[in-house]
């Protein structure tokens, strides 16, 4: 049985009065093909809300990052249906339902702390 490693890195955006915010994440996760996994993105300043405009990016080796999810849960036309974004337990979440081998990548979360995107 093959395993698909998923790597999660988090970014913060837009310095301002909250420029000391610390973003927390799982350093890496592994899921088997067909499995489900949820990556989360938390903030030391409190609960992540839709006002943080959470973005999720996917980066495959040798490629530039591409946006999967924007403004918490909106998808681009190229985002596979198996990916979804939400808020879960005070964090931004990216859920992958039915992982495929081509989903092996690094996943980045971006949060805005200035109220601007």
UniProtKB/Swiss-Prot annotation:
Region (Complementarity-determining-1): 45-53
Keywords: Adaptive immunity, Cell membrane, Disulfide bond, Immunity, Immunoglobulin, Immunoglobulin domain, Membrane, Secreted, Signal
Top-level taxonomic group: Eukaryota
Entry GO CC: extracellular region; immunoglobulin complex; plasma membrane
Signal peptide positions on this chain: 1-19
Region of interest: Complementarity-determining-2: 71-73
Coiled-coil intervals: none
Domain annotation Ig-like: ranges: 20-117
SUPFAM superfamilies: Immunoglobulin (SSF48726)
Disulfide-linked positions: 41-109
Matching InterPro entries: Ig-like_dom, Ig-like_dom_sf, Ig-like_fold, Ig_sub, Ig_V-set, IgV_Light_Chain
Swiss-Prot/TrEMBL GO biological process terms: adaptive immune response; immune response
Presence of the UniProt keyword Lipid biosynthesis in the record: no
Primary localization: secreted
Quaternary organization: Immunoglobulins are composed of two identical heavy chains and two identical light chains; disulfide-linked.
Function: V region of the variable domain of immunoglobulin light chains that participates in the antigen recognition. Immunoglobulins, also known as antibodies, are membrane-bound or secreted glycoproteins produced by B lymphocytes. In the recognition phase of humoral immunity, the membrane-bound immunoglobulins serve as receptors which, upon binding of a specific antigen, trigger the clonal expansion and differentiation of B lymphocytes into immunoglobulins-secreting plasma cells.
Protein name: Immunoglobulin lambda variable 7-46
Source organism of the structure: Homo sapiens (Human)
Gene (name only): IGLV7-46
């Amino acid at each position: 049985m093959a395993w698909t490693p998923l790597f999660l890195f988090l970014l913060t955006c837009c310095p301002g009065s909250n420029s000391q915010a610390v973003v927390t994440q799982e350093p890496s996760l592994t899921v088997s093909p067909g499995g489900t996994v949820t990556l989360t993105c938390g903030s030391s300043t409190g609960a992540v809300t839709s006002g943080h405009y959470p973005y999720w990016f996917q980066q495959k080796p040798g490629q530039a990052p591409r946006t999967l999810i924007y403004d918490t849960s909106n998808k681009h036309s190229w985002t596979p249906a198996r990916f979804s974004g939400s808020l879960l337990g005070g964090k931004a979440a990216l859920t992958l339902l039915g992982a495929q081998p081509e989903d092996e990548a690094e996943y980045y979360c971006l949060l805005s702390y200035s109220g601007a995107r």
